[in-house]
Design a protein with these regions (language model features):
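Extracellular beta-strand/loop-rich repeat segments of large surface/secreted proteins
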Residues: 1-81, 87
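Outer-membrane translocation/initiation segment of Type V secreted surface proteins
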Residues: 70-197
């Protein structure tokens, strides 16, 4: 957050516009050299994200990497404008993330770069299903049940934005909750049936 003059992010360097959503203003030109990084976060309670606003030209040279991490607070299918400039040249060679189910994609126009997280593709088929990253039959059953929830449901959203490696443990935790809730419901139903008799 703040304002700087002409800026060049060199190989091994990183540009992060702010801590907990910030806007960095560049009064002049911004250059991302090969091997540099651009790190962005988003507000999980809204549509705001880190952003760089360049008054001159944003020159994105080959090799630059945009990193988006699960700790960044991004929502799936939400479009975030992360860079605006008087003019934009070049593109990021890669965009990386640590999400298990979501892959970031970038869109460019003459003056901006936007980011959207989309469901990763499964080999030979459509989207990666929640069950594709489950290890056991119980985890797969739980994953399939979660996938039937609306995309706006908090449990669905929590699973969809898990970091890599986390889904099996999350499904184990959820299956325990499901069994406990089912058991409680069955016990309540049995008690009510006994009262009727």
């Amino acid at each position: 957050t703040g304002t700087v003059g002409d800026t060049t992010v060199r190989a091994g360097g990183a540009l992060a516009p702010g801590n907990s959503i910030g806007t960095l203003r560049v009064a002049g030109d911004l250059v991302f050299e090969p091997g540099s990084r651009f790190e962005v976060e988003a507000d999980p309670d809204g549509t705001a994200s880190d952003r760089v606003v360049v008054s001159g030209t944003a020159d994105i040279r080959g090799g630059a990497v945009l990193h988006v991490g699960p700790e960044g607070g991004f929502e799936a299918r939400q479009r975030y404008v992360i860079l605006t400039a008087g003019q934009r040249r070049g593109q990021f060679d890669a965009v990386g993330s640590g999400y298990a189910y979501l892959a970031p994609a970038l869109s460019y126009d003459a003056t901006s770069v936007a980011l959207i997280l989309q469901r990763r593709g499964a080999p030979g088929s459509g989207d990666l299903a929640f069950a594709d990253l489950a290890d056991t039959a119980n985890q797969r059953a739980t994953a399939r049940a979660v996938e039937t929830l609306p995309a706006a449901h908090p449990v669905y959203r929590a699973i969809e934005t898990l970091p890599e490696g986390a889904p099996p443990a999350a499904f184990d935790a959820l299956s325990g909750e499901v069994h406990a809730s089912t058991r409680s419901a069955l016990l309540t139903g049995a008690r009510q049936a006994q009262r009727v008799n």
